[in-house]
Amino acid sequence: MSKESSFDIVSKVDLSEVANAINIAMKEIKTRYDFKGSKSDISLEKDELVLISDDEFKLEQLKDVLIGKLIKRGVATKNIQYGKIEPAAGGTVRQRAKLVQGIDKENAKKITTIIKNTGLKVKSQVQDDQIRVSGKSKDDLQKVIAAIREADLPIEVQFVNYR
């Protein structure tokens, strides 16, 4: 009479926390002496960060400040993919960073392989940008979660919808 238990594996970035981290980082940048008179800016456009600064060195410092604030706000920095540094208007440089939302096919395959390699009696289904894992034993599901947490994945994953 045991019914199936399940959970979902997702990869999401909380955009409101990202916006909060950007605001806090910009406040710090405006008060820092080494950024006095610079044209440094961080903005959020849909699911993309845009970092602008005077030169590459200041851009790297800007990125370090932002990453520190994102970590304090609990945002996974693994889910940020930085683009190339490109020249922008007014002698500044720009870098775009994409916020990865959801699990792509390649990472879904890696995760399902990890689940299969555990040898437990669980089923995994890829559903769009998430993975549903189901099984009769809650202990098996917890072992799957532990195995996925131990794995070195290129994205940060969360576990939701325990049933």
Swiss-Prot record:
Xref: InterPro entries: DUF520 (IPR007551), UPF0234-like_C (IPR035571), UPF0234_N (IPR035570), YajQ-like_sf (IPR036183)
* Family in the record: Belongs to the YajQ family.
Coiled-coil region: none
Q: What does this protein do?
A: Nucleotide-binding protein.
Keyword terms, alphabetized: Nucleotide-binding
Q: Which organism is it from?
A: Geobacillus kaustophilus (strain HTA426)
PANTHER family, sorted: UPF0234 PROTEIN YAJQ
Question: What GO CC annotations are associated with the protein?
Answer: cytosol
In its UniProt entry, what is this protein called? Nucleotide-binding protein GK0742
Q: Name one GO molecular function term.
A: nucleotide binding
Please, which domain of life does this record's source organism belong to? Answer: Bacteria
